[in-house]
Curated annotation (Swiss-Prot):
It comes from the Eukaryota. Transmembrane segments: none annotated. GO terms for biological process: defense response to Gram-negative bacterium; innate immune response. Antibacterial peptide active against Gram-negative bacteria. It comes from Palomena prasina. Induction: By bacterial infection. Signal peptide: none annotated. This is Metalnikowin-2B. Disulfide bonds: none annotated. GO terms for cellular component: extracellular region. Keywords: Antibiotic, Antimicrobial, Immunity, Innate immunity.
Amino acid sequence: VDKPDYRPRPWPRNMI
């Protein structure tokens, strides 16, 4: 399960 967005990532979650 992907962790909630606690910190902004350089790429969208869709890419992961």
